[in-house]
């Protein structure tokens, strides 16, 4: 059916195989050969992609190649981003003069994406990102919202709600299907930039259109690599667990929490550690002298942070006890002189 279809790149024969007990590597290889032979009876045009054992990571028993138009396809998740992590695949490719394809990777932070996918491209390895759209997640370029009607179905399925009528269930499913349309999804521009913007690792770019005078939400720090737009002590999952505590709005290590109590600022930054900082490029500037107010909340005193504008220290702030994590107070940095032109505001935890 697909033999003459040029829109089809090839056939990935088995996705993320894991050999059951009792199945040998020889049998595994022979299965791949048998499938390839069956394809070649009707199609000599398309690539066959061969994934290794253990979720596409182990190619033991699968060399040498058995077809002139095949590629070894590996997956990469939750590990370090160094060349050493893919060197065995590169060596296999060089030894047998066969192309590599990284068929699946994702489910991590923007910095991890940037480092991994640049590593692949530097070594001439094509790649595929998993995945372009998920449901209420920060780790994909687009995120679909669960509608209230569909949530009612979820509650019923999980045993936490009464059974809806069939008409309601059908309407709920349709509402969620509409929510999945790309035009109805939430965009995650930082994710897309980490994958496609060649400047991501070189230039800090504004997340949104900040102005002076104006309000700058803490969660709307710049888009860019770790060390350019922000720093965070835990900024990707290298196999030892999560990289985020808030799991809202942005996909960096910066820990952001949804703030349902404030429509003006729906997200807040928390779980901060010493040395972490956030940077904000401000392009719409009216020069003058301003008071800088920073809204904070803390259940105890003792925290310290400082603010810089274009590299000049503005003040060191001792964080007071405001009464709780959600009891907000403004701290004031008065008489800040702002010149014309683009500004860079930096807030750093001490």
Specify the residue positions occupied by each region the protein language model found.
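Residue-identity detector for glutamine
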Residues: 30, 87, 95, 111, ...
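Sequence-level detector for tyrosine residue identity
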Residues: 1-2, 11, 32, 49, ...
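Aromatic-rich peripheral "rim/lid" segments of glycoside hydrolase catalytic domains that contact
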Residues: 112-210
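Detector for Asparagine
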Residues: 15, 21, 44-45, 53, ...
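Extracytoplasmic
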Residues: 194-350
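Intrinsic disorder/low-complexity segments enriched in polar/charged and small flexible residues
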Residues: 56, 68, 103, 114, ...
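Alpha-helical protein-protein interaction elements
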Residues: 3, 63-64, 69-70, 81, ...
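Extracellular glycoside hydrolase catalytic/binding regions
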Residues: 3-134, 139-155
């Amino acid at each position: 059916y697909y033999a003459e279809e040029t829109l089809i790149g090839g056939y990935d024969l088995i996705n993320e195989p894991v050999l059951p007990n009792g199945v040998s590597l020889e049998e595994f290889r022979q299965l791949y050969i048998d499938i390839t032979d069956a394809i070649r009876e009707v199609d000599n045009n398309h690539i066959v992609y061969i994934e290794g054992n253990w979720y596409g990571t182990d190619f033991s028993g699968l060399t040498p190649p058995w077809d002139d138009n095949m590629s070894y396809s590996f997956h990469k998740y939750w590990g370090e981003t160094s060349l050493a992590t893919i060197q065995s695949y590169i060596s296999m490719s060089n030894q047998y003069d066969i192309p590599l394809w990284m068929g699946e990777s994702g489910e991590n932070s923007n910095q991890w994406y940037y480092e991994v996918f640049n590593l692949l491209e530097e070594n001439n390895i094509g790649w595929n990102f998993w995945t372009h759209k998920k449901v209420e997640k920060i780790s994909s370029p687009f995120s679909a919202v669960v509608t209230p009607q569909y949530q009612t179905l979820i509650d019923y399925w999980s045993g936490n709600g009464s059974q809806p009528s069939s008409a309601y269930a059908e309407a709920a499913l349709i509402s969620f299907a509409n929510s999945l349309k790309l035009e109805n999804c939430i965009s995650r521009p930082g994710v897309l930039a980490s994958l496609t913007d060649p400047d991501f690792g070189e230039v800090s770019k504004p997340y949104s259109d900040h102005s002076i005078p104006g309000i700058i939400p803490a969660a709307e720090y710049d888009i860019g690599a770790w060390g350019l737009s922000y720093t965070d002590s835990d900024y990707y999952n290298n196999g030892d667990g999560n990289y985020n505590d808030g799991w809202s709005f942005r996909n960096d290590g910066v820990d952001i929490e949804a703030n349902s109590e404030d429509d003006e600022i729906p997200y807040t930054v928390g779980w901060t550690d010493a040395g972490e900082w956030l940077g904000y490029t401000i392009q719409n500037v009216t020069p003058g002298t301003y008071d800088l107010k920073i809204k904070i909340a803390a259940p105890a005193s003792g925290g310290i942070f400082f603010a810089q504008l274009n590299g000049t220290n503005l003040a060191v702030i001792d964080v007071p006890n405001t009464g709780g994590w959600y009891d907000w107070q403004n701290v004031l940095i008065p008489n800040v002189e702002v010149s014309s032109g683009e500004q860079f505001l930096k807030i750093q935890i001490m």
